[in-house]
Amino acid sequence: MKKILALLMIFAVSLSLFACGKADGDGKENTTVNTAAVDKTEDTSAEVTTAAEMKKGDEGNGPADINAEFITFKLPSGYKYKVDSFSKDSNNPLYGDVTLYIYKDGSYSSIATLTATARNMVRSQEEAVENTIKLCNLQTYKNGESEIGEDAQYGENTYSTVHVTTEYYEKDFFVTYANRGASDTKGLLVKFEINNKNIKADDPFIKELLDSLKIVMA
């Protein structure tokens, strides 16, 4: 009889605990919620801009991953960009052109212009440099002084450096040209232009951006 009463008491206690919820080690109801799935962690990932959504007038802040389909690069934190123009060949996504203005945060004047285009009349690195100097002269309607410096290696690309001085401005250019295979009849000209009034050619920002720039091969 005592054994039966003891079993009934144990059974009653078990039912009581089950009704009140699972007890923790102190005999208190465990009300802890697993917050791993609901906590929001700070988003530190880079903004992503792709060719599918890129259009004139688009802008954004670094850090940002820019993908124009025929080139990609990373814009560091502390800078912003604005798309001046973008287009691509519907039959070949590696053919197209893009021009972006780059600004320091809080500044209204661009410090640099990045241009990549397959719509050009050049077929080599040397012609790319000549084309850059010629365009500078045409834009100012007056011949300036151009000095071709030593080549510079950034990331996967070798850039010719050009320093241009005119009556109106002083600029540095980093110019590279890529032929992307036997089927590439146009090649890609990439030109990074900086305004010396706002940034110098040895600024760490330039290395950081150009180190990240990749030309997409066919």
Regions found by a protein language model. Give the residues of each.
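Bacterial lipoprotein signal-peptidase II cleavage site
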Residues: I4-A6, S16-T41
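N-terminal low-complexity, Pro/Thr/Ser-rich intrinsically disordered segments
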Residues: V33-S77
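Short, hydrophobic/aromatic-rich segments at coil-to-beta transitions
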Residues: D58-D65, L94-T99, Q153-H163
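Secretory pathway targeting signatures of secreted, lumenal, and periplasmic proteins
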Residues: E69-E126
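Stable alpha-helical elements in mature extracytoplasmic
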Residues: L75, Q125-T132, D202-L209
